[in-house]
Amino acid sequence: MNRRKNDFLVRPKRIRCYTQLSTLPIDLIIEILSRLPMNSIAICRLVSKQWASILQSSDFTESFLIKSPPRPRLLFTIRYGSKWHLFSAPQPRNFDENFPVVATDYHKGFSGNWCMQSFQLVNGFIYLNNRLSLKGKIDRVSVIWNPSTGQQIPLPDLGVKNSHSKSFFGYDPIEKQFKVLCITSSKEHQVLTLGTGRKLSWRKIEYSYPHYPRKKSNGICINGVLYYRNTNAMIVRFDVRSEEFRFVEIKMYVEILSLINYKGKLGVLFPNTDLAQLWVLDDTNKVEWSKHNFVFPDTTFEAIRATDTGEMFCASSCWRDSLYVSYYDLEKESVKKVKIKGIEDKLSIGKHHANEFFIFPNHVENVMVL
């Protein structure tokens, strides 16, 4: 607006700033961008090649994790109709936290014949298989996916003919490297390392004891070590960094329900008619276990898992109007239920059942680009 001063017409001055991002120190740029929320970072990657390069650097990734330490979340994968849907909800940091109802965030819906039995969640990245029909032949395509950035990395073919394979996804926190271990029925062991900047390729590794994992064993990565079930009464221990195998004997001749991360240690769940039993591997060298018994109020659960703070939880496998997650504190021997809101509204499930439903703990947002 123009103003008059002493009968003279005074026009407001417009000040323009011509400072370019390229003139600012890189450290300052990283400091500014690392304070942005995740959805804004995804948009900033599209601004310019320079911004994309900065946001893909290891310096930015480390700065972002320091400025915005990720709070673990529950990840829900639901197949409804012909489509998969991904939701997440806050995970309690303290068993005494009082929030009987939590809202979910909707991340993405995607089509395809995805095999969620192969689903493995490690440090914000997801490994899963898609079954494709190519020229009348069913083929599997393995993909590493970061739901936070949207990056999808199809893995190269193993190059092994007429062989079934089983893969496990792990992360080395020291070298900050993701690796995929693949074991074929021909007893070949191969490893693929991601994020090296070179073309992805499989390489064979040495092993001292021929073995093949159980079909339903997805395995779990804990502090740089992959654990998965063998066909015998033992668990295989694979060090992601050194790529060495060790074997942990289980003197319990019943079917294992699942392997879990219990407060940074390997937990083995055994089913029972009246209660569940948890074995915790307290000493990996001496193979010493501590044992815990517990009972869940809901017997029709999808699976029993554990949060990063040690609460056991499960979600009902049959739900319509509302989804509840039950948490169990082993030390206090107490149970609480949390209502999960938003899934039924987004999918308009109503009285219909979801076709398939899986829940995974300890998901964190990761800005890393492999």
Swiss-Prot record:
Task: Give disulfide pairs as residue numbers.
Answer: none
> Which InterPro entries does the protein's record reference?
F-box-assoc_dom_typ3 (IPR013187), F-box-assoc_interact_dom (IPR017451), F-box-like_dom_sf (IPR036047), F-box_dom (IPR001810)
- One Pfam entry for this protein is F-box
**Any idea where the F-box domain is?**
18-64
Q: Which PANTHER family match?
A: BNAA05G37150D PROTEIN-RELATED, F-BOX ASSOCIATED UBIQUITINATION EFFECTOR FAMILY PROTEIN-RELATED
- Record's protein name: Putative F-box protein At1g46984
